[in-house]
Curated annotation (Swiss-Prot):
This is Deoxyribonuclease-2-beta. Belongs to the DNase II family. InterPro entries: DNase_II. Glycans are attached at N77, N98, N114, N273. It catalyses: Endonucleolytic cleavage to nucleoside 3'-phosphates and 3'-phosphooligonucleotide end-products. It comes from the Eukaryota. The gene is Dnase2b. The keyword Glycosyltransferase does not apply. Keywords: Endonuclease, Glycoprotein, Hydrolase, Lysosome, Nuclease, Signal.
Amino acid sequence: MTAQPLKAALPLLFVALSGVLGTPVISCINEDGKAVDWFAFYKLPRRTSRGGTGMGLDYLYLDSTMRTWSKSHHLINSSRSSLGRTLEQLYEAHNAKNDTAYLIYNDAVPASVNYSGNYGHAKGLLVWNRVQGFWLIHSIPKFPPVPEKGYEYPSSGRQYAQSGLCITLKYSQYETIDSQLLVFQPNIYSCFIPNIFRWELIHMPQMCAKSSASKIPSRRLTVLQSAQGLNFLHFAKSTFYTDDIFAAWIAQKLKVHLLVESWQRKNHELPSNCSLPYHVYNIKAIRGPLQSDFPSHHDHSKWCVSTKDSQARWTCIGDLNRSPHQALRSGGFICSKNRYIYQSFDRLVSHYASCN
């Protein structure tokens, strides 16, 4: 057998043997401890003024078995939250050090006072074996701690709203993810990638070892498919692509007008943009399902939805803000046409800024 057919046959052989060998089936997990194809969360901001008394630990939850947001049964700092349940697989992988890999990245590393501008403005983690795994993309600085510390939610993550998306993926998707990470160059602060993955995955092991010498593309767009067949588009930009990812790329590629929620500090924001065929509008207030509306500057999440008059209903969740400085940073967004994801995020829009 030649090297190329052998390379193609190895993952299939591993999947066939996994049931016999007891390989764990890694996935996104809900609060009941059950595997789901995907879930989204929206952590609400801390509220101390009239109309809201939240501690900044409540979150909205939506997964592949649901049609709209529900209030979480547990606080986000609980190990019984959807994040806590899902990350339990990370801690098991760390303790076992067997054939399960993980990679954790954040431009704001836990237990550090410094924010890294040398890597992507991106936050997330991946856990996988040769059967499947999950990719969690989120907006929470300093999360999660290194695996040996177990599950903790940072106190700094309470003040503002945060968002994230977890997708369960077959191992066949990880070569594509490997190429996407090369583009946006995340700041990896904890990782373990056994040698068995180096047949197919080139860049993640190199980045894990801080030794990547591969040429970085300006940008890359690819299709990812969840374990149950839901298609996603992933946009990844490097520092060589210096335009606003929303206005210059995502809106024009999807051919939709976008309503964008991102962290926009005063005097550091990009205004709504109607100069291109497809427009981008900044969301200015969020309609809180469990509390009164709150302004966009209380929201650290990064997401967008197409306007209702667009021909397609898209939702994107990811890494970057609409600001001049962020146009120079690398990062990405993952987008879906799932109707329930769209409807749930669209209902959060209270009002947005027009170009006038």
